[in-house]
A protein has these predicted regions:
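Flexible, gly/pro- and Lys/Arg-enriched active-site loops
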Residues: 99-105
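Conserved N-terminal beta1-alpha1 strand-loop-helix module at the mouth
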Residues: 1-96, 110-115
Length: 115
C-alpha cells in the first residue's frame, strides 16, 4: 500500500500471552490490571499448562475467574488456550485451538455460534 499524506496508520494494540504458570493469582491479577490500564490491550490469551504440557484446568479456572471480567472491562478480549469448554464456563470471548488440538468444527460445536 502506498502512503499518502492523508494516510492514517491504524493504532497498534497489544496481544498478551500469559505465562504457562501463575502461582500468585491475586498478585498476577493486580499486575495484569496495571498492564491493562497502561496500554491498549486488544486481547489476552490464558495458556496455563501442567508439567506434561497439558492444559491445567484447575489453574485456568482460578486465574480465569480472577481476570476475565476485569480484562473485558478494559476492552480486552479473553482467549482460553486449547479448551473450548473452559472458555464457555469462564465467559471468555474466544478460544485458541492449535493445529494439534481439536478441529475448528469441534470447537465451534462446544462454544456455539455466538462466541
Amino acid at each position: 500500500m502506498s502512503k499518502t499524506k492523508d494516510y492514517v496508520r491504524p493504532r497498534t494494540r497489544l496481544y498478551l500471552i500469559m505465562p504457562p504458570r501463575i502461582e500468585d493469582v491475586e498478585g498476577f491479577a493486580a499486575l495484569l490490571e496495571t498492564a491493562l490500564s497502561a496500554g491498549d490491550v486488544a486481547c489476552l490469551q490464558l495458556r496455563l499448562k501442567t508439567d506434561t504440557g497439558e492444559i491445567d484446568a484447575e489453574a485456568t479456572r482460578a486465574v480465569g475467574a480472577a481476570i476475565t471480567e476485569m480484562a473485558q472491562a478494559y476492552g480486552a478480549a479473553v482467549l482460553i488456550n486449547d479448551s473450548p469448554d473452559l472458555a464457555v464456563e469462564l465467559g471468555a470471548d474466544g478460544v485458541h485451538v492449535g493445529l494439534e488440538d481439536m478441529s475448528v468444527k469441534q470447537a465451534r460445536e462446544i462454544v456455539g455460534p455466538d462466541m
